Amino acid sequence: HLKRPCKFSCPVDAITYDEHGISVIDKNKCIRCGKCIHSCPFGAIASKTFIVPVINALREGKHIYAMAAPATEGQFGADITMESWRKAMKELGFVDFYDVGLGGDMTAAYEAEEWAEAYKEGQKKVTSCCPAFVNMVRLHYPQLADNISTTVSPMCAISRMIKAQDPEAITVFIGPCLAKKSEVVDQQIEGNADYVLTYSEIRAIMKAKDVELEACPNDNQTASTFGKRFANSGGVTAAVLESLKESDNCIDAKVCRANGSQECKKA
C-alpha cells in the first residue's frame, strides 16, 4: 500500500491497513492529537462533535457557560477581543463567558508548588496540560506515568471554578485543539468541561443563529500574559517558573522544552 497522508502524519504509528487496504486506527496507540484529521485530503477522519448536546442545552435554557482558550483572542482579527466573544456567547444563550488564560494562572500556581516538592525529593515531573502528551506518556512510556503532574489543566480549573459557583453549570470549552475532546471523553476528570467545541463548530452555531463577532475594546482581561501563553512551546514552563519566582519556593529547576510530538518523543 502507498503510505497515505494520515499514516505519514501519525507520530506514534497508530495507523495500519486491513486486508482491504482500508486505514485502521489502533485505539491502544492513538494519542488523539488530531494530526491525521488535518492531514487527510479526503475528510475521511473526523473527531467526535458535541454540537447537538450544546445546542440542546442552549435551547432548553440550562445553565451553560462558555470557556475560551487564550488563542481565541485575535484569532478572528485584531479587533475581535475576548469582550467580543463574551457578547456573542451571551447572545447565543450562554450564561457567561470565561477566558481560560485565568485557569493557566491557577494551574501555574499549583504546579509550582508541586515542582518545588518534587525538586526537594529528587523527582522529575512532566506537565499535564496537554491531553495528547499525557496520552503519549501513558500509552507509549508507561514507566513515566507516575511523573505526570497531578495538577489539572487550565480548562478543568476554570470549569471547577464555575461549577463551584453554580452547581447546575454545564461548561463548554472553545478552542483550536482537538485533543481537548479526549481530555473530556477519555480522562473523565471530576469537574472538567462537559463539552468541547472547535472554532469551526462554534462558528457553525453562531451562523445558524445569525450571531456575529463584533469589534470591541480589549478591556476584558482576567489573565496574565503567562497564563495566556500556555499553548506556546515552553509556555507552561515559563508560567510555572514565574510562579516559583513569586513564591518562597526558590529552586534551581532544570527544564526540557519540546515543540510537537516528535520532540516530545526525543525528550
What kind of region is each of these model predictions?
Residues K48-A267:
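Iron-sulfur-associated redox domains of electron-transfer enzymes in respiratory
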Residues H1-I31, K35-I51:
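Iron-sulfur cluster-binding cysteine motifs and their immediate structural context
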